[in-house]
Amino acid sequence: MIIYFAIYCFLGYLLESCYVSILQRKWISSGLLKGPFIPLYGLGALLLILLFPYLHTSYYLSFFVGGIAMTILEYFASVYIEKAFHTRCWDYSRHPCQLHGRISLFYFIIWCFLSLLFIQYIHPFFMSLNIMNDSVSLICLIYLGFILKAFIDRLQFHKINGLDIH
């Protein structure tokens, strides 16, 4: 699972950075942490992997249940990030059909399509690579170490600057 977490953190970073860069018309390195990874995408991927046995046989389930699961994760991640880091990484309050600016109908639909692609095509592709060998595991553990270090650095930055972290 660590391998998949690392891969999908990186792919999520690429996806989000490309999306934001297209909107801004210049390269933007997305994410709360420094480095080429966004843990929310890794967590989302792990959630979908846990649901995979129940969803992969149906495009409809992959689409709707995956989208609902990812939207719920996005909501609670937004709450956690705001409380832990005193920052808001996204704000959908100007979108129609949104809830507390944390989730919106537009991004729910995006999550539905991404969940469908992930469950039906992306994750089966990575499973077929049979990447569970020692060297890849070592690389992923090192990568996970970078993610943890970036997270710890972020917490220490807030602590040094006198911000309350819960």
Give short role names for the model-derived ranges:
Residues M1-H166:
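Aromatic-rich, lipid-facing transmembrane alpha helices and their immediate juxtamembrane interface loops
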